[in-house]
Amino acid sequence: MNDIKYNVERFYKTLTTNEFYERFSNFEVVQGYCKECPRYDTNYSCSPLGIDIKEFITSYDYIDIIVTQVQYDEKVYNADYSKDELNDVINKTFFKERKKVVDKLLDTEKKYTKAESLTGPCNHCTPKCKEVYSECKHPEIRRYSLASLGIDSKKILKDLFDIDLILINGKLPKYMNNISSILYTK
């Protein structure tokens, strides 16, 4: 499984933060999905957050949205995988490509007067760090996820990029999307 054939395509869009919040905030629906996640209420970049989300987002002027789409060759996505093999394929492709974008966004933050990337969930600390620490020990490197802010990723994909969200459901899909973004003030 060393030679996994795939292509990567990236899509970009810039919006004002006011437009972004008004179009894509769907807190109650998104939080329903968050509550099903094993990371819910276990770390300081995932829900629930102790911040005013609208104020946080709109305190910046713009948001750049980057979709990284990993497109698998037909033989790759039609293959049968055990759970461990499927996780291995995803780690060697999707998460590898996601990390490239995250690293670039963290570097890009330095170019603006005020900026913060939305690349969560956080993996810098102990798993379930909320059980260990009463507050985030590394707020300077913690980044929120779009979902923790109540942002509807499915709607972003469809409305801005005309991309349908395909769920994994135990089988590798034809493509996988990661949405990363950076809030900034010039």
Regions found by a protein language model. Name each.
Residues 3-186:
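Catalytic cores of enzyme domains
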